[in-house]
Regions:
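Ferredoxin-type iron-sulfur electron-transfer modules in oxidoreductases and energy-metabolism complexes
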Residues: 292-321, 331, 337-381
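Phosphate-binding glycine-rich loops and their immediate beta-loop-alpha structural context
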Residues: 324
């Protein structure tokens, strides 16, 4: 570590420490967190009691992820071959700039773009990039929609607006929609639905992440509850899926294992929707001739982002962080996160966030404060 790096770490730590103290003293954040943590723990316990076998399936999935990372080059090539065989396009992007350049060739100025939740897109700072290109960008996940308009940052891997109580959401929606919106959660959800409907139907491009990608078929797995990802990936003419290399698993069955384990640990007995996407929309209804571009997207673009993941895989200890399913359960069990929300992190949060940050995002200067905040209590395990 150089002297300059030490100086950067000191400066980053000072800013970071101030953010933590401010979060702990913010009554609004503390109210939202206490409600969310209590609700999550209650629901997760119910889900695991109903499906006790999920703990063994998690062990099985760990072996799948370990195998996948050991064979990542081979599996990534297999995904690319399968996607392109089914008339999609696939890029294995070494760095964020490669992914952004590819996306810039797909979208056009003044395009209306709808997005579903994707942490990998956050690695790219994709919204800022698209807006600089002259595009109109709509986050459609309710939590992402809220923080987009608050100009905040995600405060949880799965629930990005976890730090915003319903009263503040009502104030925000009243401002956005030009009318009084009460702090009733059911009403707030309906107002967001109404507001976003127009964007869904006008959008030229839909951008999603992926919970898993099966190499044998090139199939993208998307888990959701709101139904927005189905509209994002089904209505626009172009669909772009952005995923880290670690989302690749060998088979369709492995992808379904990800769905089952991730959704249960995310505290859902069953997700509302699971989408499997393997190609642009197609039909063979006339003379059994397959034609691409039916009711859904005419184009499918899959971007597999490396961004130092292959370097991380070479480290026998740190590569385990890439087994993470992004269910977010560890954060609710953490002794620090319920006090500070996503200020305990740099996009990727909590103890595991220190490792992911060091390799995928800000390097040591951003990772060190997160690592030193961790109490090493082990509750996240």
């Amino acid at each position: 570590v150089t002297e300059d790096t030490n100086k950067e770490i000191d400066e980053t730590f000072a800013r970071y420490q101030e953010e933590l103290w401010n979060a702990m003293e913010d009554e609004t954040i503390q109210l939202a967190l206490s409600r969310a943590v209590e609700s999550f723990r209650r629901n997760k316990d119910e889900a695991l009691k109903l499906y006790p076998q999920v703990k063994e399936k998690a062990k099985e999935l760990r072996k799948v992820k370990e195998y996948s990372l050991l064979h990542i080059d081979e599996l990534a090539k297999q995904v690319k071959d399968r996607v392109e065989d089914l008339k999609g396009q696939c890029l294995i992007a070494k760095e964020p700039k490669d992914a952004l350049k590819y996306i810039s060739e797909i979208v056009k100025e003044k395009d209306i773009i709808v997005k579903s939740k994707s942490l990998t897109c956050e690695e790219l700072h994709l919204n800022d990039y698209l807006e600089k290109l002259g595009c109109e960008v709509y986050e459609t996940d309710l939590g992402e929609f809220i923080i987009q308009h608050l100009k905040s940052r995600p405060m949880h891997i799965l629930s990005p607006a976890i730090h915003v109580p319903k009263e503040k959401v009502a104030e925000l929606f009243s401002s956005i929609m030009g009318k009084s919106v009460p702090p009733d959660i059911g009403v707030l959800v309906k107002e967001a639905r109404i507001f976003l409907r127009d964007a869904f139907f006008k959008a030229n491009v839909g951008i999603s992440g992926a919970n898993a990608i099966a190499a044998e078929t090139g199939t993208i797995f998307l888990i959701e509850n709101e139904g927005n990802a189905r509209l994002v990936t089904g209505l626009p003419r172009k669909h772009i899926a952005v995923a880290g290399l670690e989302k690749i698993v060998p088979t369709l069955q492995d992808g379904m294992l990800v769905v089952e384990v991730a959704s249960r640990y995310a505290n859902y007995k069953a997700p509302s929707y699971v989408s499997l996407i393997s190609s642009p929309s197609k039909t063979g209804d006339i003379e059994k001739q397959t034609t691409y571009g039916a009711h859904g997207p005419e184009e499918l673009h899959v971007i597999l982002l490396d961004n130092n993941r292959t370097e991380m895989i070479k480290d026998s200890t740190y590569k385990q962080a890439l087994y993470c399913l992004r269910c977010g359960a560890c954060l609710y069990e953490c002794s620090i996160y319920p006090l500070t929300a996503g200020y305990y992190g740099h996009l990727y949060m909590g103890g595991i966030g220190a490792i992911l940050t060091a390799f995928l995002l800000g390097g040591l200067e951003n990772a060190a404060p997160i690592a030193y905040t961790c109490t090493l209590c082990g509750r996240c395990k």
